[in-house]
Amino acid sequence: MIGEKKKCIGLIFGGHSNEHEVSISSAKTVFKAFKAQINRERFTVKAFYINKYGDWLDSDISEKILTGEIENYKTKKQEIFNQEKINFLDGIEFQNIDVWFPLLHGFNGEDGSIHGLIRFTKKPLVGCGIIGSALGMDKILMKTIFSNHKLPQVNYLVFQNEDLNDKQVKNKIINEILKKLKFPVFVKPSNSGSSLGISKVKNESEILLALEKAWGIDPRILIEEGLEVREIECGIIGNSKLITSEIGEVNYESDWYDYDSKYHSNNKIIIPAEIDSKITNEIKEIAIKSCRALNIFGFARVDFFLEKSSNKILLNEINTIPGFTKNSMFPMLWEASGLKIEQLVAKLVDISLDL
């Protein structure tokens, strides 16, 4: 707006989670959106890349990573600070940031870690707070709260900090799965995103390998009963008043919606999803209720299953920093709802300033 001081956006991306590359792709989209003509009078952007070792690189280098001038930059010569320094908030690069926009998918970012760090700057951030972020990242805690709020979910089991090197423990877990769930089942680490560490298990012989795969990421393991379902997603933005996007559906070619399906396949995206208006409204209501239950605001993507045989709505999970890649559903949902990506990022900043 003419005469109004431009807001400086601090875009944080990369990180040392296993979703590092996804974060870079998301940041490229958001960076480009802020640089678009429609946003030039309102915003400037400073990018801050965190490499896989946890080192923060300065904004000049970080911007070149986003524009493609530099690839796989790993030197520490241009860092603002590293893990041994604690006075990083005094750095001149941080002083002029008006709003932070973290795009760190996965642990040490999306789990509330970066939100806690940003709190020390006393500047607003795009997204929800520490508690909502932590709960949204932890599948076990999330599902426990959903259960307490009587929100519909698939049947599931939880195993926490079990010693998989102990044969008796392994047998106990397998027996409980056989007793309480029906195949196929999905074995998931509690703290992970983008379907990393998840396995679809079709019979007893596949359980152990799936448990070990999930255990390698997180010793807290969630096991869900697999059903014949449609993958449905809903975007959320807002603070005290949450607004829902159009409902979308993902049709994927693979056996299930795994990492490759999300980022490397030619999935068919249907927006709005071809479902009954009554079901659509119920999904939107549950999406808002689920975010309220976890104290999630700002923006999020809520994922659902719609059982094919019964049209039963089943809440899957909430993603508090959804992807902004070219294949990501969140920006597509909002574009179908009337907000192009350039308008969406500006709207998210406005929401953060309204808190």
Curated annotation (Swiss-Prot):
Function: Cell wall formation.
InterPro entries assigned: ATP-grasp (IPR011761), ATP_grasp_subdomain_1 (IPR013815), D-Ala_lig_Van_CS (IPR000291), D_ala_D_ala (IPR005905), Dala_Dala_lig_C (IPR011095), Dala_Dala_lig_N (IPR011127), PreATP-grasp_dom_sf (IPR016185)
Manner of cofactor binding, per the entry note: Binds 2 magnesium or manganese ions per subunit.
Gene: ddl
GO terms for MF: ATP binding; D-alanine-D-alanine ligase activity; metal ion binding
Stored NCBIfam families: D_ala_D_alaTIGR (TIGR01205), PRK01966.1-4 (NF002528)
Binding site for ATP: 178-233
Cofactor: Mg(2+); Mn(2+)
Annotated EC: 6.3.2.4
SUPFAM superfamilies: Glutathione synthetase ATP-binding domain-like, PreATP-grasp domain
Intracellular or extracellular location(s): Cytoplasm
Keyword Cell wall biogenesis/degradation: yes
Catalytic activity line of the entry: 2 D-alanine + ATP = D-alanyl-D-alanine + ADP + phosphate + H(+)
Pathway(s) of this molecule: Cell wall biogenesis; peptidoglycan biosynthesis
Any Pfam family: Dala_Dala_lig_N
UniProt-recorded name of the protein: D-alanine--D-alanine ligase
Domain ATP-grasp: 143-350
Keywords: ATP-binding, Cell shape, Cell wall biogenesis/degradation, Cytoplasm, Ligase, Magnesium, Manganese, Metal-binding, Nucleotide-binding, Peptidoglycan synthesis
Domain of life where this protein originates: Bacteria
Family: Belongs to the D-alanine--D-alanine ligase family.
GO term, biological process aspect, one: peptidoglycan biosynthetic process
Keyword DNA-binding: no
Organism name: Prochlorococcus marinus (strain MIT 9301)
Gene Ontology terms: cellular component: cytosol
Binding positions for Mg(2+) 2 per the UniProt entry: E317, N319
Binding annotation for Mg(2+) 1: D303, E317
Signal peptide: none
